[in-house]
Every structure is written in C-alpha cells, then in structure tokens.
C-alpha cells in the first residue's frame, strides 16, 4: 500500500532542462520533492524544483550529494554517467531507475541495436563503421542513401548524417568525428512513437503519436497517429518487446518507423520522458511526467486514456544568433480555446533550440487532428522571438 508523509519522498534528477522542470511540476501535487543536478546555474528545472546542485553530469561529488539527498535517482538526459551512478548507488544505497545498465545500453547506438535485434525487435539493417569503406560497403548492400550515426553523444537528431553516395563517405565520417554506425535508409510512411512506462509488475502505453521532423528535429506530434488499427497494435507490440530488454522502472520514449508497406521498425529509444510525449500533459488522464514519478517510486501507474485528440508543436529558437530569450506575440495562444503554452525558462535563445511548446486539444466533437494541426501551426507561426 502506498503511503504519503510530510515531507514526501525526494527524487534526485540528473539533468535540469525542460524535462526535469516538467518532472518537478508533475511531482509537486503528489507531495514529491525534486532536487536536480545540472551544470547550468538557474537551469529551467531549478525554477520549480526544491533545489539545484550545480555540477557536471559526470561529477562524482555532485552525484554523491544528489544521492544522499534523495530517496531515488533518475535522469532526464543520456549524458548522465552510468558508471558513476552505478557506483554511487551501490555505496549510498539510493536506487537508480531506469537502471544504469539500461543507460549503458542506450549510450551506444550500436550496442543498443545489437541487443534489440538479438531480442527479436525489428530494426533496420545496420553495421559498425571503422572507416569510409564500411559506409561504401553498406551502400553496396543497402543501396543509397544510408544514414550514418554517431554511436554516442547524439540526441534530438544530433550526430545523424545522411550519405547520398559513396563519394560522400569520407566527408560524412569526418563530420561525425567519433565511433559510428550506419543504417539502411528507411522508406517510411510516417514516424511514430510510443511513450511506454515500466512499473512494478505492470506496463502502460500511451496512445500512438505521429511525429513530424525537420532537419532531424521534432516539430510536431499528432495524436492519435493517422495509422491503421493494425499498424497501431503492431507498434504497441514492438514497444512492449523493447521494455523487456530495458532494465528498471520509468518512462521510455520509443521512436518507430511505419514503413510504406505497413511494417514497424525501431528507430531509437530514450530511457526518460520524451519530447514526443509532451502532449500528454493536457491530452491524457496522466501525463508522461507523472507516470515517470510514479514508476521510479514504485507507485501504481495512472490511466493513459486519451482525453481528446491533441497536437503539440515545438517552439524553436527563431533567431540568427544566441541572445536573451524573449517570446512575443503570445496573445493568440492565450486566447485560443484548447491551447496551452509551455515556456521552459531558458535564459538564452539559440537557433533551433527548444524554448517551449504549444499543445492544442479538441475544443469540440468536430475537431479533427487535421484541424488541430492547422491551429497549432498558425499559433506557432504567430509568436516571435524578440532580441
């Protein structure tokens, strides 16, 4: 039986960006306190968390301090050092969820794909890359183009380089600047994602989201995805198979390709709340952030039932160069029924930096996802980033 006391449990979060901020916002109504560790003073999460430890993500002293102040540790960024977290968890007795072993698997995309393929999860053909000849061999086997990926350090599309021909192999490899892998290019109908939650002896999945990317950056998520019922069920099956491989409680963002012939292939996994799940704050009974809080604490999971069709659009830094973050012309968002603005509190705007998002939910029975998408795009276009 779950019991609350005052003060309630404390979650220590490695990372203090927008995900940590929204975790802290979801934790507060449950009586749960959050302390974050982040190298940036006054990071977005620090504005709502109980406290911030200013330290690098792999700083052993900082993570030890975090562990000693928390009942459980989690992370909102894959740059967390799994070896440091594992060692400090063992020394302090503060559990980590998801487990550091899962973080280790996720850190290296080649290791990730091999483990998932061995478990029967459908993935695009791939191979390790030691030199440009490996890329050329992949083009021989898979056809052009292929996708070159940095094995470590890449997220939000960073470190992904399409290679159009053998002549481009050398330059592409130099641009990745580190260990790499290459995948066949997937001819997809749409990109989708399942936000899945692993709790104590229970699993939950949120409604399938359809994702629109530009320049490898998520722009929009549309829910429910415009996929067939059969494809949707297959996506859930693949997500559950992925959770079997992952070790530890928490939310997992599982990105998938829906191919033109109706198959589902795994793209990538994030062992944390995911940008393509931000819509759940308004769109479902329990948000992905509250689910993560519940899951890592070992509490019962909440309902993932859809409240209404929903569209989320990111607010990306529409600036030429870095400068103070100011968002203008937000009146239309504030005046639109069903629209919700989330501003992350980042002090500096940079080109294409995720500064916030807008969610639009159906205001009536006649609102289709296409109508909501049009509204969301209009609202995103109306705001301005001011110098």
Protein language model features and the residues they cover:
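Internal nucleotide-binding/catalytic subdomain
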Residues: 159, 163-254, 258-260
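A conserved helix-loop-beta module that forms one wall/lid of the active-site cleft
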Residues: 99-161, 166-167
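Haloarchaeal acidic low-complexity proteome signature biased toward cell-envelope/secretome components but also
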Residues: 1-10, 28, 50, 197, ...
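Active-site "cap" helix and flanking loop/linker of ATP-utilizing ligase/carboxylase catalytic domains
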Residues: 236-253, 270-319
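A short beta-strand motif that forms the metal-chelation/ATP-contact edge
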Residues: 196, 263-273
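Peripheral (often C-terminal) accessory segments that flank ATP-dependent C-N-forming ligase machineries
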Residues: 294-387
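ATP-binding N-terminal substructure of ATP-dependent carboxylate-amine bond-forming enzymes
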Residues: 1-102, 106-107, 133
């Amino acid at each position: 039986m779950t019991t609350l006391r005052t003060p309630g449990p404390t979650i220590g979060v490695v990372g203090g960006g927008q995900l940590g901020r929204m975790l802290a916002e979801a934790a507060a109504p449950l009586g749960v306190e959050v302390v974050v560790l982040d190298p940036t003073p006054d990071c977005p999460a620090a504005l709502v968390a109980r406290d911030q430890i200013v330290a690098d993500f792999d700083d052993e002293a900082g993570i030890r301090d975090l562990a000693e102040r928390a009942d459980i540790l989690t992370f909102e960024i894959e740059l967390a050092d799994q070896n440091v977290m594992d060692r400090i968890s063992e020394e302090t007795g503060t559990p980590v969820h998801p487990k550091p072993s899962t973080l280790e698997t996720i850190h290296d995309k080649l290791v990730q794909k091999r483990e998932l393929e061995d478990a029967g999860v459908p993935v695009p053909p791939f191979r390790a890359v030691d030199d440009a000849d490996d890329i050329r061999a992949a083009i021989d086997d898979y056809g052009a183009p292929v996708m070159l990926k940095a094995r470590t350090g890449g997220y939000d599309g960073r470190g992904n380089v399409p290679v159009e021909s053998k002549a481009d192999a050398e330059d592409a490899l130099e641009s990745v600047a580190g260990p790499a892998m290459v995948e066949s290019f997937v001819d997809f109908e749409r990109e989708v994602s399942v936000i899945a939650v692993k709790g104590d002896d229970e699993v939950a999945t949120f409604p399938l989201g359809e994702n629109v990317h530009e320049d490898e950056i998520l722009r929009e998520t549309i829910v429910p995805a415009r996929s067939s019922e059969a494809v949707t069920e297959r996506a859930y099956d693949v997500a559950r198979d992925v959770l079997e491989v992952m070790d530890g409680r928490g939310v997992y963002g599982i990105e998938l390709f829906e191919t033109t012939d109706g198959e589902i292939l795994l793209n990538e996994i994030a062992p944390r709340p995911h940008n393509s799940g931000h819509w759940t704050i308004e769109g479902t009974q329990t948000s992905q952030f509250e689910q993560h809080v519940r899951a890592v604490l070992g509490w019962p999971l909440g309902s993932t039932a859809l409240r209404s069709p929903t569209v989320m659009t990111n607010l990306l830094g529409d600036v030429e160069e870095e400068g103070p973050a100011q968002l203008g012309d937000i009146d239309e968002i504030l005046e639109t029924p069903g629209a919700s603005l989330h501003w992350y509190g980042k002090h500096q705007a940079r080109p294409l930096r995720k500064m916030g998002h807008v969610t639009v939910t159906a205001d009536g029975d006649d609102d289709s996802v296409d109508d909501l998408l049009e509204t969301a795009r209009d609202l995103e276009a109306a705001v301005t980033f001011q110098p």
